[in-house]
Amino acid sequence: MAFDKIKQFTKVQFLHWTEEEFSSCFRKMLTLEQYREPQMAQLYQNYLASGPLTYMEALFSGMLGDAGKARQTALDFYGPIFLLYSIYDGAEDKSHVIKLLEEHMDHFLQEMQIS
């Protein structure tokens, strides 16, 4: 998957979980309910935590050809994006958070191309 496709996929997913009313409410509900219900914890992991991380790890593994490095690269890439969900929820200027997301991806993928 090319860098542009990773950026496009990531932004679409971020907007899905933040700007679509049902998905945003579902994400917030999963965040709370993961501590009360094992099924909700599993959904939270699949949709927002380990699921996206594993997906990105597989992409980076194919690009890098190194499974060990792919895991760390996926953590480095997805960690800030995961944090941006919370920042988005509390932000008055939501467009600024989208800009932060785009800047993170541009910087990260540019650094990856250099190394």
What would you call each of these model-derived segments?
Residues 1-12, 43-58, 99, 103:
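Alpha-helical structural segments
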Residues 2-8, 30-35, 81-83:
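Short amphipathic alpha-helical segments, especially helix-boundary/capping motifs
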Residues 19, 24-25, 31, 38-65:
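Amphipathic alpha-helical packing segments from all-alpha helical-bundle domains
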Residues 42, 50, 60-112:
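Hydrophobic/aromatic-rich alpha-helical bundle segments in the mid-to-C-terminal region
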